[in-house]
Amino acid sequence: MKTNIVPIANAIFFCGDRVEGSGNPVIERISNLQKLSEIVVSKFGSSINAWVIEASVFNGPFAVYKDFIPSMNQYGEPRSYNPIGFPASTSTVSLLSNCLEEAKKVILRTQVGSRSGCTFACSFSQPKTFILGFSKGGTVLNQIVTELGFSDIGSNVNSPNVGSENTYIVPKTKEDLLNSISDIHYVDVGLNTAGAYLTNHDVFERISKRLMQGAPQLRFLLHGTPRQWNDKRRDWIRNEKDKMLRLLESEVPKSLGKLKVFSRYYFNNMPPSMQMHFEIIESLDVS
């Protein structure tokens, strides 16, 4: 009997805009979707499932996450983050569920004609969820964090829904997803307009309140390079990052020690470049 082991966590990586024909072999290699999934697994361990998500729509090279963010311009830049309808968490759950079903079909087809079977193991603990947003992919994180702040803790925290096997491979509902999130990684995020980082104090106050009411520990990790954090032409990126960091840190004392906040700066002695913007993915410290 060949068993597909249930992961200890699902790591979901949201990509940014496309960079094609750069002529830079480092950028071309790291931006490959298969390579990205391998990097994610190398960071979190082989007992996780890695999911690399691109926008469903592109306007030229610009990623447009229209199914995840309710209000944006034609270039995929958000006008606001609003929890109504929970579009980002709902879309994420739908994507993971569809991908899992396709994976099952592929695995079952490979077993046809062989003596070994294939089963999807059941588990009594729901896997954690790690979410990573790279470059413009950080806008999806902002939307998910907003939805997290406005979501109910619910009775399913640390209480698995017995009898539903998919629950233990990927979250089946937006509540499952939001309540399973333990790590939120902003990876060199940035935009050509405001909105790269979330600066809504109300959202962070609500998240702190959730933690006090029994939600599991939550870590925010902000990873950056000079490419984004030292860009004088887009100084709002650093200003937004600094404000988000201050807002999060102001909630730490209220969270009963369950909110953890980290800021990590990479390649700080190097001049800004597009290459370092991608190399940070390989250099991520997710500990």
Segments from the language model and where they lie:
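Short, surface-exposed "cap/lid" segments of acyl-processing enzymes
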Residues: 1-69
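A domain-start/cap signature at the N-terminus of enzymes
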Residues: 1-10, 44-49, 88, 110, ...
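Conserved beta-strand elements of beta-rich interaction domains across eukaryotes
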Residues: 16-20, 56-58, 136-137, 190-192, ...
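Well-ordered, non-membrane alpha-helical segments in soluble/globular domains
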Residues: 26-38, 85-103, 145-171, 197-209, ...
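Structural alpha-beta junctions
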Residues: 37-51, 180, 210-220, 245-261
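Short acidic, low-complexity segments enriched in Ser/Thr/Gly/Pro
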Residues: 52-115, 156-161
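Serine-dependent carboxylesterase/thioesterase catalytic core
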Residues: 101-217, 227-230
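C-terminal catalytic histidine-bearing segment of alpha/beta-hydrolase fold enzymes
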Residues: 221-287
